[in-house]
Amino acid sequence: MKFFVALALFACLGSLALAKDDEYCQNTVITACSTSAFSANSICNARFAGIDHIEPEIQSYINANLAKSYDYLLLATHFNSYQKNRPGFQKLYQGLSDRSFEDSIALIKQVTRRGGIVDFNTRHESSGSVSTKRGTLEVDELHSLALALDTEKQLATGATHVHSRATHATDAERDPELAHYFEENFLGKQAESVRKLSGYANDLAKLMKVPDPSLSVYLFDEYLQKQ
């Protein structure tokens, strides 16, 4: 009788040990490495904390930055034409385009560093999603600043949303590393961009309150070239 009790206890402990094996890389690494490549569901990866919860939000934000980068590039091209000939505005929007593109590359590196895979066909809608709808970009100088300001506010709101999800989620979904990354690389920078563009828009609006604002716009463009 004692033999059967001991055998049952041994079998129970063995099943518990096997159940725990799937939770740690050290218990499955030999099996995983015996194949040609780690499977997508392997525990031997760089994913930890709340990356599963936040990855779709970051993916959406990457797509938004890429879309806005091309919008800014179109604005820069518009003001670089011989008809408009506004090199100051061209410089401003070219800089914003380059920054958004570089932010996309940095985010792609961050996602892959954390064990994620970037899929540009993924569409994730949330309260922090940035609109990628493209409106009319052939606008005058003042309206272009208003358009850029709206875009920067959208990007800032999107970054704030990702940071909030990484910070205020449940214990299993919280990700302090990603929250710190967004705080260090996006929130302060985008707050400064919103402040700068809002100042530009207000200054130019005041300068244009004259019967013929062409000289005011020309001087403002000269100012932008020096920034």
Swiss-Prot record:
Q: Which domain of life is it from?
A: Eukaryota
Q: Which PROSITE patterns match?
A: FERRITIN_LIKE
Is Secreted a UniProt keyword of this protein? yes
- Cell compartment(s), UniProt: Golgi apparatus; Secreted
* Secretion signal span: 1-19
Instruction: Please name the CDD domains in this protein's record.
Output: Euk_Ferritin
Which one GO biological process term can you cite for this protein? iron ion import across plasma membrane
Q: Which GO terms describe its molecular function?
A: ferric iron binding; ferrous iron binding; ferroxidase activity
Cite the record's note on assembly. Oligomer of 12 light (L) chains and 12 heavy (H) chains; L and H chains are disulfide-linked. The functional molecule forms a roughly spherical shell with a diameter of 12 nm and contains a central cavity into which the insoluble ferric iron core is deposited.
Please explain the role this protein plays, according to its UniProt record: Stores iron in a soluble, non-toxic, readily available form. Important for iron homeostasis. Iron is taken up in the ferrous form and deposited as ferric hydroxides after oxidation. Ferritin is composed of a heavy (H) chain which is responsible for the oxidation and uptake of ferrous iron, and a light (L) chain which facilitates the nucleation of the ferrihydrite iron core. Required for dietary iron absorption in the midgut. Involved in tissue iron detoxification by exporting excess iron. Plays a role in the maintenance of circadian rhythms. Required for embryo and larval development.
Q: Please report which protein family the annotation says this sequence is part of.
A: Belongs to the ferritin family.
The identity of this protein, by name, is Ferritin light chain
What species is this protein from? Drosophila melanogaster
* Gene, per the UniProt record: Fer2LCH
